[in-house]
């Protein structure tokens, strides 16, 4: 909406100015304005542009539950025993455009809170893996799960199986989108 209003009303705001205003609406807004592949840090407002992600089919499934982001962050216990994804290695994987390395190195520490409270999320992840995903992970604080696939046909079969399973109320099949406008 901010991008559109900037165009419609010929405000002349730069992308950076739009991003500064957007973060006041929500942490994800600057990412949507920036477009493309990025490393998000902080609460998601600190963005570093990355090369485009390797194209692949993506299955998205949201169960019929809602998750309180506040609940997840209040119950997150960041101790020395917590395994964090290796961000530097993941960025290198993205630069190499190696889907299998990306899948092996991705992770979400918020799953340690959300999955025990909502086991259906683990069921959805397992279902995707059983149907050919190279990996599946919860998005953000949940409850939505995405799975990366290396073949379109496998992703289509997984999509149909997920819809038939009843695990998710909303199921979408898409692909990585790399339109990073200047």
Model-derived features: positions:
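DPxDG-like acidic metal-binding loop motif
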Residues: 1-17, 31
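Conserved, helical-rich catalytic subdomain that frames metal- and/or nucleotide-binding sites
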Residues: 40-135, 150-153, 159-163, 172-182
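Short, small-residue alpha-helix embedded
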Residues: 1-8, 139-149
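Hydrophobic packing within well-folded, soluble alpha/beta domains
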Residues: 1, 5, 22, 121-124, ...
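A glycine- and small-aliphatic-rich helix-loop capping segment at beta-alpha/alpha-beta transitions
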Residues: 4-11, 37, 151-157
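Short, well-structured alpha-helical segments that form the helix of a local strand-helix-strand
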Residues: 13-24, 106, 156-160
